C-alpha cells in the first residue's frame, strides 16, 4: 500500500531503517545523506567512549586543521584583512574526496608554518624597531640631561654620601671648563639611562628613592609619540630617564630595579661626539630594520589576503567533514564482512529518495556490492517530524518552545498560525499602530536577503519572526477597523446611526443625549459607530462589548481545542478517550460556558428598548445558576423557561464529573482483566528483539524491505519498555485530569478576560499619549505653534513606536502566547514526543555558532 501523503496537520510517518554500507564508501554515503538531511541516526556504540571509536583519529586530525584555520582568521583580524564570507545562496561546495581533504590538511600545515615564521620574524623585527626607537630617544634626550647635570654639581654632590664630599670638592676645584665632560668619570659618578612606561614612573621613582635612601640624581622627559608595545601590539606612552649615582653596586642595583619595573636600559656615552656617532649608527640600523619590517609585513599581508579568499570555504568543508566522521562513529562495524551497519529514523515517504541516493553513490564508486536499506518493524516511539516552510517555521518554533508534539498527534502549530496573531490583534487593536507594524513587516520581507546577514541578536530574533509580525499586523488592522480606533481617535468612514438631540436651552457643559436616526432602518455597517468616541458612557459600552467578546473568543478557542482531542483519539484508535474524556468534557464545558455564550448572543440580539424591560446581568445569572439553582436574580428572565433550562444544564454538568472520573479507569481495568482471562499478557507489556541480534538477522543482501527486519512488537504505540497495568496509577491520573479539567474550565475562561484588559490598556495609553503631545500641539498657533507641532509629532511618533508598538506589542504577544500554550494546548496536546534531528549539513550551517562569522 502506498504511504500516506505528508501534511502539516500532523507529523510525518516515520520508519526505522537499517543500512548496510560497504566500508570503502562509508564516508561518501554519509556525505550524500548529509546533503539530503533526511536520516536521524541512532548511536549503536553507546557503550564505547569517544576515544574508543573507530574514526576518532580522523576527527582529531580535522580538529588540528580547524585550529590552523582559526589561527589564520585571528592573524587576519590582527592585520585588518577582511574575510571573504561564504554565501550559501551563491557559492556551491562540492563534496570533497579524501585526497582533497588530505591536500587541504597538508596545505594548512604548510601555510601555518609559513605564516608563523613570517609572524615571528615580524614580531622580532618590530621589537627591534621599538628598541632602536627608544634608544634614539634616549640618545636625543641624554644631551640635555648631561648639560643640566653639569650645571647642578652641588645638587649631585648633595645626593651622594657625605664621606665622598671632600673628594668631589677637590675634583671640582682642579677641573677646568675644558675638562667638564669627563668630570663624571673623574668624580666616580656613573649613570643609568633607559625608557619606562609613563604609568610606572611615579612608582619607579619612589622605589629608587627608598631603596637608595636618596643617593641618586634623576632626570626624566616624556616621549611625545606613543610607541607600539610588541607584546600586546598596542600604543604605550613612555618616558626617558637618566639616573646619576656613584658606586658600581648602586648602579647595578638601579639596573636591577629598572628591569624589574619593566624598563629598558640602554648604553649611552657621556661624551657628545661619541653620542653623535651612536645616533648616526642607530638611525642607520633603524632604517634597515624598517625596510625589512615593511617587506615582511607586505609578504605576510599578501599571504593572509590570499588565504582570506578561501578560508570560509575551507572552514565549512572541514566542519562538514568532522560531522561526517562523528556520524560514522555512530555506526557499528562488522569486521567479518567489512561492512558498516547503521540504524536511524527517516520519513517513510522519503525512503525511495534515500534508496536512489545510496544507489548513486554506489554507481559513482563502481562497487559491485550494493548498499542496502531495510525498513525495521519496531515498538519504539518514532521522533516527531513536522515539515515547515519559510512561513510556518516561526510559528512551529514558538510551539516547540513549549514542547514537542507526540508522534502523529494533531500539530498544535496549525491553529496557532491563525489564533495566536488574531488574539494578539484583539489586545493590540489600533489601526494606526497596526499600519506601522505592517510596514515594518513588509520591509523585512521585501529586503529579506540583505537583512538575513545582519548579526545583531535582537534584530535577528525579530527578523526570524517576520511572518508572525506580518500576520499580527494584518489582523490588527482588521481589529483596529472593528474598534474604529486609530491613534486613540475615531474614523468617520460611514454615516453614524445616532444623532444628537440638542435642547433649546443648551449651554456649554450640559449633557446631550443621542437617539437612533432611523429606529427600524439604518445601522452602522462595519465596526464601532464613531459617535461613541468621546461620550460619557463610552467606556461603559466598550468595556461591556470587549468583555463579552473576550468570553466568546475564549469559548471558541477552547471548544475547537477540545475537538482536536477527539481527532487525536480517533487517529490513535482509543475510543475510551472519546467516551471517557471528550464527550463528558465537552458536555460539561458547553453546559456552563456554551450556555453563557448563547445568553450573551441572545442578549445582544434582543431590542431591550423596544420591550421596555431592563436586561438582566449575566454575571449574576451565572452565580445564581450554581448557588441557587432554579432561582433568577431579581426574578427577571432573559427568556421564558430560563430557570428550568439552567437546572437541567447544571444537572447535566454535574453528571459528567463521575463519568470523567470513573469511566476510563474502570473500562481499562475490565479490558485488562478480559485479556488476562484469555491468556494474554497485560495491556502495555511488550517484547523487543534487538535489531542487531545475529540469530534473528536476515541476509542483508536481500533487497526486500522487511526481510532484514529484526524488530518485533505487540503494541504499535509502545516505547520498547515492559509496563504492567496498574489500576491505582491510572485512577490517580484520571482524578488529577478530572479536577484539572473542571477547575480549568472556569479559570481558563476567566483568563481570556485579558483580551479585554489589554485592549483597554492600549486604548487608554494611546489616548493619554495623544492628549500629552499632539492635542496640545494642534491647539497652538503661529510660528511657535508650527515649531511645537514638529517637535510634538516627533515625540508622539517615537513614543508611539517604543511604548505602544514595541512594549505593548511584546506584552500582547506574550499574553497571546500564554493563551495558546496553556488555555488551548492543555485541552488536546500531550507533548510527549521527541524531535526529529536528522544529520543535515544545511541545519549544521544554520545552527553552528562557530560558523556564523564565516557565512554571509
From Swiss-Prot:
Family: Belongs to the V-ATPase 116 kDa subunit family.
Protein name in the entry: V-type proton ATPase subunit a
Keyword Ion transport: yes
Compartment list: Vacuole membrane
Keyword line: Hydrogen ion transport, Ion transport, Membrane, Transmembrane, Transmembrane helix, Transport, Vacuole
Main location: membrane
Pfam families in the record: V_ATPase_I
Organism phylogeny: Eukaryota, Fungi, Dikarya, Ascomycota, Pezizomycotina
Function: Subunit of the V0 complex of vacuolar(H+)-ATPase (V-ATPase), a multisubunit enzyme composed of a peripheral complex (V1) that hydrolyzes ATP and a membrane integral complex (V0) that translocates protons. V-ATPase is responsible for acidifying and maintaining the pH of intracellular compartments.
Complex and partners: V-ATPase is a heteromultimeric enzyme composed of a peripheral catalytic V1 complex (components A to H) attached to an integral membrane V0 proton pore complex (components: a, c, c', c'', d, e, f and VOA1).
UniProt feature, compositional bias: Acidic residues: 692-707
Vacuolar compartment segments: 429-430, 491-544, 604-648, 764-784
Amino acid at each position: 500500500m502506498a504511504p500516506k501523503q505528508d501534511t502539516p496537520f500532523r507529523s510525518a510517518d516515520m520508519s526505522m531503517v537499517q543500512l548496510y554500507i560497504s566500508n570503502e564508501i562509508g564516508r561518501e554515503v554519509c556525505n550524500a545523506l548529509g546533503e539530503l538531511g533526511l536520516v536521524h541516526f541512532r548511536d549503536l556504540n553507546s557503550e564505547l567512549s569517544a576515544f574508543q571509536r573507530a574514526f576518532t583519529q580522523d576527527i582529531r586530525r580535522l580538529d588540528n586543521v580547524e585550529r590552523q584555520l582559526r589561527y589564520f582568521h585571528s592573524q587576519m583580524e590582527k592585520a585588518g584583512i577582511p574575510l571573504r564570507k561564504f554565501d550559501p545562496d551563491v557559492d556551491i561546495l562540492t563534496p570533497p574526496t579524501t585526497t582533497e581533504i588530505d591536500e587541504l590538511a597538508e596545505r594548512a600545515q604548510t601555510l601555518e608554518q609559513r605564516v608563523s615564521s613570517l609572524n615571528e620574524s615580524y614580531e622580532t623585527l618590530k621589537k627591534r624597531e621599538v628598541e632602536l626607537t627608544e634608544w634614539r630617544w634616549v640618545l636625543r634626550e641624554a644631551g640635555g640631561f648631561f648639560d643640566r647635570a653639569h650645571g647642578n654639581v652641588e645638587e649631585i654632590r648633595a645626593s651622594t654620601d657625605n664621606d665622598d664630599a671632600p673628594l668631589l670638592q677637590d675634583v671640582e676645584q682642579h677641573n677646568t671648563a675644558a675638562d667638564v665632560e669627563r668630570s663624571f668619570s673623574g668624580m666616580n659618578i656613573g649613570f643609568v639611562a633607559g625608557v619606562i612606561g609613563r604609568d610606572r614612573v611615579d612608582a619607579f621613582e619612589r622605589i629608587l628613592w627608598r631603596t637608595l635612601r636618596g643617593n641618586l640624581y634623576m632626570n626624566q622627559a616624556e616621549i611625545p609619540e606613543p610607541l607600539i608595545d610588541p607584546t600586546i601590539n598596542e600604543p604605550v606612552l613612555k618616558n626617558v630617564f637618566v639616573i646619576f649615582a656613584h658606586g658600581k653596586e648602586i648602579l647595578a642595583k638601579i639596573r636591577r630595579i629598572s628591569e624589574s619595573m619593566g624598563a629598558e636600559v640602554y648604553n649611552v656615552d657621556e661624551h657628545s661626539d661619541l653620542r653623535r656617532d651612536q645616533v648616526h649608527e642607530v638611525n642607520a640600523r633603524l632604517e634597515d630594520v624598517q625596510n625589512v619590517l615593511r617587506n615582511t609585513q607586505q609578504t605576510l599581508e599578501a599571504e593572509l589576503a590570499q588565504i582570506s579568499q578561501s578560508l570560509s570555504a575551507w572552514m565549512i568543508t572541514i566542519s562538514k567533514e568532522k560531522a561526517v566522521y562523528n556520524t560514522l562513529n555512530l555506526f557499528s562495524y562488522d569486521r567479518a564482512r567489512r561492512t558498516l551497519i547503521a540504524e536511524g529514523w527517516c520519513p517513510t515517504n522519503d525512503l525511495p529518495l534515500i534508496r536512489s541516493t545510496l544507489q548513486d553513490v554506489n554507481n559513482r564508486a563502481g562497487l559491485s556490492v550494493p548498499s542496502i536499506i531495510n525498513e525495521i518493524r519496531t515498538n519504539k516511539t518514532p521522533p516527531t517530524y513536522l515539515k515547515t516552510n519559510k512561513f510556518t517555521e516561526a510559528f512551529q518554533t514558538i510551539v516547540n518552545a513549549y514542547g514537542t508534539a507526540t508522534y502523529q498527534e494533531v500539530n498544535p502549530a496549525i491553529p496557532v498560525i491563525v489564533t495566536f496573531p488574531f488574539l494578539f490583534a484583539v489586545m493590540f487593536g489600533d489601526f494606526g499602530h497596526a499600519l506601522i507594524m505592517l510596514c515594518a513587516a513588509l520591509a523585512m520581507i521585501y529586503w529579506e536577503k540583505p537583512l538575513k546577514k545582519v548579526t545583531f541578536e535582537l534584530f535577528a530574533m525579530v527578523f526570524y519572526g517576520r511572518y508572525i509580525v506580518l500576520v499580527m499586523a494584518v489582523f490588527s488592522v482588521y481589529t483596529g477597523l472593528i474598534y474604529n480606533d486609530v491613534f486613540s481617535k475615531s474614523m468617520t468612514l460611514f454615516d453614524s446611526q445616532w444623532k444628537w438631540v440638542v435642547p433649546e436651552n443648551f449651554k456649554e457643559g450640559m449633557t446631550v443625549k443621542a437617539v437612533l436616526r432611523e429606529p427600524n432602518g439604518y445601522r452602522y455597517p462595519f465596526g464601532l459607530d464613531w459617535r461613541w468616541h468621546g461620550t460619557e458612557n463610552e467606556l461603559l459600552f466598550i468595556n461591556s462589548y470587549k468583555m463579552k467578546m473576550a468570553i466568546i473568543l475564549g469559548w471558541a478557542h477552547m471548544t475547537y481545542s477540545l475537538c482536536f482531542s477527539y481527532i487525536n483519539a480517533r487517529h490513535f484508535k482509543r475510543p475510551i478517550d472519546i467516551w471517557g474524556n471528550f464527550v463528558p468534557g465537552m458536555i460539561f464545558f458547553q453546559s456552563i460556558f456554551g450556555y453563557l455564550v448563547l445568553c450573551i448572543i441572545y442578549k445582544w440580539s434582543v431590542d431591550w428598548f423596544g420591550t421596555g424591560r431592563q436586561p438582566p446581568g449575566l454575571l449574576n445569572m451565572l452565580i445564581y445558576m450554581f448557588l441557587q439553582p432554579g432561582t433568577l436574580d431579581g426574578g427577571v428572565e432573559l427568556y421564558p423557561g430560563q430557570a428550568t433550562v439552567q437546572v437541567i444544564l447544571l444537572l447535566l454538568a454535574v453528571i459528567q464529573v463521575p463519568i470523567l472520573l470513573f469511566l476510563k479507569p474502570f473500562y481499562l481495568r475490565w479490558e485488562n482483566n478480559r485479556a488476562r482471562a484469555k491468556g494474554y499478557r497485560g495491556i502495555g507489556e511488550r517484547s523487543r528483539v534487538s535489531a542487531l541480534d545475529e540469530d534473528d538477522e536476515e541476509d542483508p543482501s536481500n533487497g526486500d524491505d522487511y526481510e532484514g527486519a529484526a524488530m518485533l512488537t505487540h503494541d504499535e504505540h509502545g516505547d520498547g519498555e515492559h509496563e504492567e497495568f496498574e489500576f491505582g496509577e491510572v485512577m490517580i491520573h484520571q482524578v488529577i485530569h478530572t479536577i484539572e479539567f473542571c477547575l480549568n474550565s472556569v479559570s481558563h475562561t476567566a483568563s481570556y478576560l485579558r483580551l479585554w484588559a489589554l485592549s483597554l490598556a492600549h486604548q487608554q495609553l494611546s489616548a493619554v499619549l495623544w492628549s500629552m503631545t499632539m492635542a496640545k500641539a494642534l491647539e497652538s498657533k503661529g510660528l511657535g505653534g508650527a515649531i511645537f507641532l514638529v517637535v510634538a509629532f516627533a515625540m508622539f511618533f517615537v513614543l508611539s513606536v517604543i511604548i505602544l508598538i514595541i512594549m505593548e506589542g511584546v506584552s500582547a504577544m506574550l499574553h497571546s502566547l500564554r493563551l495558546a500554550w496553556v488555555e488551548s494546548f492543555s485541552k488536546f496536546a500531550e507533548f510527549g514526543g521527541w524531535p526529529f534531528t536528522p544529520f543535515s549539513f544545511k541545519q549544521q550551517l544554520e545552527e553552528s555558532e562557530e560558523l556564523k562569522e564565516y557565512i554571509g
